[in-house]
Amino acid sequence: MDTGAKLKKGAGERKGGGPKKKPVSRSVKAGLQFPVGRIGRFLKKGRYAQRVGSGAPVYLAAVLEYLAAEVLELAGNAARDNKKNRIIPRHVLLAVRNDEELGKLLAGVTIAHGGVLPNINPVLLPKKAEKAAAAATKEPKSPAKATKSPKKA
């Protein structure tokens, strides 16, 4: 009678007889911060395909995490360049638009409260070369103007 109770395995008892192990998430197994399980759920729920492989959410989470880290790194640099400690949408826009590859990836994306890149058409700028050439051909200023003469004489 006692032997029948020993053969039965409960939820707390494992095959080896040891205690139950703590569950480890797929994000931890992959060494990621982004949620692999949630991304897998979104892939299934979104009906992008009939079936979703077990490696697909892990790969997608890794790609998304890399892109987020890249954008945040560049936005942090832009914030530091502007002597700010907090990243704002303007810094994100400057980071994305000044990077060639990210700019190409996010070409059709509008970033709210990002503004625009500072850009002045060179045609509209005053011509420095002409000013410098004109100043060189003009007579140098008279020394009388350069030195102050006493007004009382």
UniProtKB/Swiss-Prot annotation:
<dbReference type="GO" id="GO:0000786">
    <property type="term" value="C:nucleosome"/>
</dbReference>
<keyword id="KW-0539">Nucleus</keyword>
<dbReference type="Pfam" id="PF00125">
    <property type="entry name" value="Histone"/>
</dbReference>
<dbReference type="GO" id="GO:0003677">
    <property type="term" value="F:DNA binding"/>
</dbReference>
<dbReference type="InterPro" id="IPR032454">
    <property type="entry name" value="Histone_H2A_C"/>
</dbReference>
<feature type="compositionally biased region" description="Low complexity">
    <location>
        <begin position="132"/>
        <end position="147"/>
    </location>
</feature>
<feature type="region of interest" description="Disordered">
    <location>
        <begin position="1"/>
        <end position="27"/>
    </location>
</feature>
<feature type="short sequence motif" description="SPKK motif">
    <location>
        <begin position="149"/>
        <end position="152"/>
    </location>
</feature>
<keyword id="KW-0238">DNA-binding</keyword>
<dbReference type="GO" id="GO:0030527">
    <property type="term" value="F:structural constituent of chromatin"/>
</dbReference>
<comment type="similarity">
    <text>Belongs to the histone H2A family.</text>
</comment>
<keyword id="KW-0158">Chromosome</keyword>
<dbReference type="GO" id="GO:0046982">
    <property type="term" value="F:protein heterodimerization activity"/>
</dbReference>
<feature type="region of interest" description="Disordered">
    <location>
        <begin position="131"/>
        <end position="153"/>
    </location>
</feature>
<comment type="function">
    <text>Core component of nucleosome. Nucleosomes wrap and compact DNA into chromatin, limiting DNA accessibility to the cellular machineries which require DNA as a template. Histones thereby play a central role in transcription regulation, DNA repair, DNA replication and chromosomal stability. DNA accessibility is regulated via a complex set of post-translational modifications of histones, also called histone code, and nucleosome remodeling.</text>
</comment>
<dbReference type="GO" id="GO:0005634">
    <property type="term" value="C:nucleus"/>
</dbReference>
<dbReference type="Pfam" id="PF16211">
    <property type="entry name" value="Histone_H2A_C"/>
</dbReference>
<dbReference type="InterPro" id="IPR007125">
    <property type="entry name" value="Histone_H2A/H2B/H3"/>
</dbReference>
<dbReference type="InterPro" id="IPR009072">
    <property type="entry name" value="Histone-fold"/>
</dbReference>
<protein>
    <recommendedName>
        <fullName>Histone H2A</fullName>
    </recommendedName>
</protein>
<keyword id="KW-0544">Nucleosome core</keyword>
<comment type="subunit">
    <text>The nucleosome is a histone octamer containing two molecules each of H2A, H2B, H3 and H4 assembled in one H3-H4 heterotetramer and two H2A-H2B heterodimers. The octamer wraps approximately 147 bp of DNA.</text>
</comment>
<dbReference type="InterPro" id="IPR032458">
    <property type="entry name" value="Histone_H2A_CS"/>
</dbReference>
<dbReference type="InterPro" id="IPR002119">
    <property type="entry name" value="Histone_H2A"/>
</dbReference>
